[in-house]
UniProtKB/Swiss-Prot annotation:
This is Large ribosomal subunit protein bL12. GO terms for cellular component: cytosolic large ribosomal subunit. It holds the Pfam family Ribosomal_L12. InterPro entries: Ribosomal_bL12, Ribosomal_bL12_C, Ribosomal_bL12_C/ClpS-like, Ribosomal_bL12_oligo, Ribosomal_bL12_oligo_N_sf. It comes from Bacillus cereus (strain ATCC 14579 / DSM 31 / CCUG 7414 / JCM 2152 / NBRC 15305 / NCIMB 9373 / NCTC 2599 / NRRL B-3711). NCBIfam families: L12 (TIGR00855). Keywords: Ribonucleoprotein, Ribosomal protein. GO terms for molecular function: mRNA binding; structural constituent of ribosome. Coiled coil: none annotated.
Length: 119
């Protein structure tokens, strides 16, 4: 029996006969004819590319004075505020930065020995 003959036979069947055929095939081959259900509810949002990043200083490292200077340059803070920020790590240095800007800030801080995370 060819595929075409099987298709012609299926075309001539009633809905009840098709239902019986599907059940018989399921039993014979141990499969189900149910359509797979997608369970990924929030995955669509996670798949969208992130456009804003937070740059977090996790550790000042050994060259704290150089890190303070870079933090002042990036944030525009005064000496006292920048020192407090560096002393109380982990702290967010820049919020909602573009990807390129966040990477530049990270590179500047790592260059002077700081540990940085981009989130």
């Amino acid at each position: 029996m060819t595929k075409e003959q099987i298709i012609e036979a299926v075309k001539s069947m009633t809905v009840l006969e098709l239902n019986d055929l599907v059940k018989a095939i399921e039993e014979e081959f141990g499969v189900t004819a149910a359509a797979p259900v997608a369970v990924a509810g929030g995955a669509g949002e996670a798949a969208a590319e992130k456009t804003e990043f937070d740059v977090e200083l996790t550790s000042a490292g050994a060259q704290k004075i150089k890190v303070i200077k870079v933090v002042r340059e990036i944030t525009g803070l005064g000496l006292k505020e920048a020192k407090e920020l560096v002393d109380n790590t982990p702290k967010v240095i820049k919020e909602a930065a573009a990807k390129e800007e966040a990477e530049e800030i990270k590179a500047k801080l790592e260059e002077v020995g700081a540990a940085v995370e981009v989130k």
